[in-house]
Amino acid sequence: MVTQALLPSGLVASAVVAASSANLGPGFDSVGLALSLYDEIIVETTDSGLTVTVDGEGGDQVPLGPEHLVVRAVQHGLQAAGVSAAGLAVRCRNAIPHSRGLGSSAAAVVGGLAAVNGLVVQTDSSPSSDAELIQLASEFEGHPDNAAAAVLGGAVVSWTDHSGDRPNYSAVSLRLHPDIRLFTAIPEQRSSTAETRVLLPAQVSHDDARFNVSRAALLVVALTERPDLLMAATEDLLHQPQRAAAMTASAEYLRLLRRHNVAAALSGAGPSLIALSTDSELPTDAVEFGAAKGFAVTELTVGEAVRWSPTVRVPG
C-alpha cells in the first residue's frame, strides 16, 4: 500500500479558468474554443473537515460537500500527485453560467486540478503538465474538447486513443484567425449534456458521417486561415438536428442566424449558441430576435489558458 504524503495545513493556491464552447458544429467531442468568461477557485489546506463556498453562477444549484465537482477534482489531483490533505477549504467565484453548454463542468474540473498544482509546488512535489491536466480532466468529462480548451486556452483539436488499458486524451492548439469575432447567445433555459446526449442515435449513416468528416476538416482551415469558409465549415448532421426538439428556441435562433449568413452553432450540447463572424457586430434584427426570445447576446474574446499560482495566506 502506497502512503501518501500529508500536505501541511495553511497552504493556499488559486486558479483562474475559462469557459469553453465545444463542437463548433461538426467537431463533435473534438473541437473546443476557450471563451473570455472566467471562474476563480481558491483552495486552502486545513487541519480537518471540508468547507465549500460558491459565489456567483450556480451558487444555489451545486452541492456544498465532497460531491462538489471542484472538490472531487482537487481530490483527484492530490491523489495523482501522491499527496493528501487532512482538510480543505474551497471557494469558487463563478462567472460561467451553469448547464448552458459553456463548459462550466470542465472549468470546475480543470480549475480544481490546476489549484492542486499551486498547492504541491509549495512542497517537494512537481505540478502536473498541461498534457497531464488534460488527461486528468478528461477522465472526468469522458471527452477532451472542453477540458483541453480550458487547459490550453484558444482553439483546440482533441482526440482520444482507446488502444491502451484506459483512454488516453490529447490535444493540440490552433492559432485562431485574427479576423474572427466571437458572439454568444445564452438563454435562460438550462440543459445538461447527459440529458441531450441520449437523443443521439447509436449509429449514423455513412453519408452523414462523410458529410461531418469533410466539414470538421474544413473547420480547421476556416478557423486558422480561411474565415470566409466558416458557414460551410460549421454545418453538422450528427448532433444539432437531433437535439433541436429539446431546445426549440435555440434551434429557431440558430436557423435565423444562419439565414443571415452568420456561422452559428450550438455551444456544446446547448442551449447556448456560439457565432463566429468577421463582422464587427451581428445583424440588428438577429440581435433583436434573440433579446425578444430571452437570449443574452454578448461579444466575447478568445479565452486564455488556465492560470494557477501559490498564494500567501492573509490572516483574519
From Swiss-Prot:
One of its GO terms (molecular function) is homoserine kinase activity. It holds the Pfam family GHMP_kinases_N. This is Homoserine kinase. Catalyzes the ATP-dependent phosphorylation of L-homoserine to L-homoserine phosphate. One of its GO terms (biological process) is threonine biosynthetic process. It is an enzyme of class 2 (transferase). Belongs to the GHMP kinase family. Homoserine kinase subfamily. Was identified as a high-confidence drug target. GO terms for cellular component: cytoplasm. It comes from Mycobacterium tuberculosis (strain ATCC 25618 / H37Rv). Its main location: cytoplasm.
